[in-house]
Amino acid sequence: MKSLVSCAWLVTIVALPFSQSALARDAQYDVLVATHAKANNLPEALVHRVIVRESGYRPSLVSHGNIGLMQIKFGTARGLGYTGTAEGLRDPETNLTWAVKYLAGAWRAASGDHKRAMHYYASGYYHAAKRQRHPAPPRLEELTSANAQQVAK
């Protein structure tokens, strides 16, 4: 029993710096996440969950062709209208702009279910959206055009 308590104490001491570090990174991106979540009608908690799962708040992470905070693929971002370089997706603002837009499509295809939305984000939601006849997320040009029309009114 004494060794079990000692082991638990050791695990707590070792894990504490990592959890505090993760919380510090979380706070660093709170405003950015809130802005993009609101713009795409998503719960902030869902965006944070994806970031934690995909990169642990490491914006420079590249793994198997997935890039940045939300580990979006360059081809996926290009399909949504991104015209920059793959390297540009390491920028947190750029990464969230395109990855949260993609997550919004997964969220709609999942009918608002967090767990399913995360699954669709990681594995693709094309077929689920097609079955449900959800429209594709708007491209940047469409968003810019719609905003310009609202401003003109």
Predicted segments, located by residue:
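Catalytic and binding regions of secreted/periplasmic enzymes and modules that target cell-wall glycans
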Residues: 100-139
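Solvent-exposed loop/turn segments at secondary-structure junctions
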Residues: 55-58, 76-79, 124-127
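Positively charged n-region of N-terminal signal peptides that target proteins for export
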Residues: 1-6
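Substrate-binding/active-site groove segments that recognize
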Residues: 65-82
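Export/targeting segments at the very N-terminus of extracytoplasmic proteins
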Residues: 18-56
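Bacterial N-terminal signal peptides
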Residues: 7-17
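A short, structured beta-strand-centered segment in the mid-to-C-terminal lobe
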Residues: 87-94
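Proline-rich, low-complexity linker regions of envelope-associated factors in Gram-negative bacteria
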Residues: 20-29, 141-153
